[in-house]
């Protein structure tokens, strides 16, 4: 049996103690949640697809010199990652009006934005992740100005790369959410991309049909989430159509 020490469990992933100091194993669950887990369902195979898609993206970003927590994919559901101190912010980059931005500002969904917009949200489920400003972030000590600058510069680079990556397979990157962390190496610290980038955390539309290929299919009760995620993986060339996506998970340590 595969038993190990569980460090943390979130809505979509579990962190286990890694094989070496300074590492974790990140396990991708099949849980689908929306509206801060007010809506919840188990969708068989979702974790496998998110693991593969996120691995593909993080590997490309690493080759471009963008620092991330990713080390390698271990198996169908798990990644070996560097242990980082997570900054309690969700960083959202928006290219097209959708979701809360469209609702908040009365914009038509799908309307192109004049420029890409970066937003910050305080990670707190009990408060429904409120939107915050740079002044909030520094005043409450969540990050210092230089860290915010590093996060914004990395976000711009990541958005530029992802927009091109998805456009190359006929997918439009509408918006996406990221998390960043502090990676300590000896006496030095740097900001790195953490968590995941997948159809769970990004809005992805087919360029021709405008079909949604992301978690909005679950949020809006549209159905077909697994088929949409598989289509994203297929277009990116990272999963064969006949590849199994339902291996069993590890035994949890309570």
Swiss-Prot record:
UniProt GO BP: 'de novo' IMP biosynthetic process; cobalamin biosynthetic process
Entry keyword set: ATP-binding, Ligase, Nucleotide-binding, Purine biosynthesis
The organism's place on the tree of life at top rank: Bacteria
Reactions mediated catalytically: 5-amino-1-(5-phospho-D-ribosyl)imidazole-4-carboxylate + L-aspartate + ATP = (2S)-2-[5-amino-1-(5-phospho-beta-D-ribosyl)imidazole-4-carboxamido]succinate + ADP + phosphate + 2 H(+)
Listed pathway(s): Purine metabolism; IMP biosynthesis via de novo pathway; 5-amino-1-(5-phospho-D-ribosyl)imidazole-4-carboxamide from 5-amino-1-(5-phospho-D-ribosyl)imidazole-4-carboxylate: step 1/2
CDD domains xrefs: SAICAR_synt_PurC
Protein name, per record: Phosphoribosylaminoimidazole-succinocarboxamide synthase
């Amino acid at each position: 049996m595969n038993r190990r020490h569980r460090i943390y469990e979130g809505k979509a992933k579990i962190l286990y103690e890694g094989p070496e100091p300074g590492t974790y194993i990140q396990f991708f669950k099949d849980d689908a949640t929306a509206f801060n887990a007010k809506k919840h369902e188990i969708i068989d195979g979702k974790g496998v697809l998110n693991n593969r898609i996120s691995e593909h993206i993080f590997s490309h970003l690493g080759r471009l010199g963008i620092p991330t927590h990713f080390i390698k994919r271990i198996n169908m559901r798990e990644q070996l990652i560097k242990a980082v101190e997570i900054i309690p912010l969700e960083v959202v980059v928006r290219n097209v009006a959708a979701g809360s931005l469209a609702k908040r500002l009365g914009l038509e969904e799908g309307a192109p934005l004049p420029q890409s917009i970066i937003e910050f949200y305080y990670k707190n489920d009990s408060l429904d992740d409120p939107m915050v400003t740079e002044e909030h972030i520094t005043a409450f000590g969540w990050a210092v100005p230089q860290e915010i600058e590093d996060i914004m510069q990395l976000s711009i680079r990541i958005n530029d790369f992802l927009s091109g990556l998805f456009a190359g397979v006929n997918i439009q990157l509408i918006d996406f959410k990221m998390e960043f962390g502090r990676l300590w190496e000896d006496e030095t610290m740097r900001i790195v991309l953490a968590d995941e980038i997948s159809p769970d955390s990004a809005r992805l539309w087919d360029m021709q049909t405008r079909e949604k290929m992301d978690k909005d299919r679950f949020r809006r009760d549209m159905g077909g989430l697994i088929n949409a995620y598989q289509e994203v993986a297929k277009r990116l060339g990272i999963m064969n159509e006949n590849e199994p996506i339902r291996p069993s998970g590890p035994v949890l340590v309570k």
